[in-house]
Amino acid sequence: MKLRLLSGALCTAVALGFAHPALSAEKAQDFVNKAAEGGIFEVESSKIVQGKVKDQAVNDFAQKMITDHGAANAKLQSIAGEQKLEIPAEMDAMHKSDLEALKSANGSADQSYVKMQQDAHADAVKLFQDYAADGDNAELKAFAQQTLPTLKMHQEMIEKIASG
């Protein structure tokens, strides 16, 4: 009886050991998916509003998003490639819908863009904080830790613009 119980426990432990790398890959891939979709959205939405916004601070912020998130996106793509993870080919439906709303905005898109960037940066900061703390891939975890201060700075900038 004890031998049967021990054998069952050992089989379960071995099975869980083999299952763990798959769980890790899924978690890393999930981070890559969300980080890439968010990063692409921040660049593309910023490109759309340049010239459509009236507030110079918003325009300057949009340019910074193109530069900073463009660089972060390239670094993420490089790390993902090295780690054999895939970058999503396109954004999710919500981000696509937000881009369409910006494209079709009549007149100034300041308020819509600022709100979208507030939401995007709140999501990004949480995603990167969580992965920096509990990430399962050392390279991606380091990327999250290195990128987080910039995301927090962006979040502070957009909150200041929104309140001003």
Language-model regions, residue ranges each:
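His/Met- and acidic-residue-enriched segments that coordinate or traffic transition-metal cofactors
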Residues: 2-164
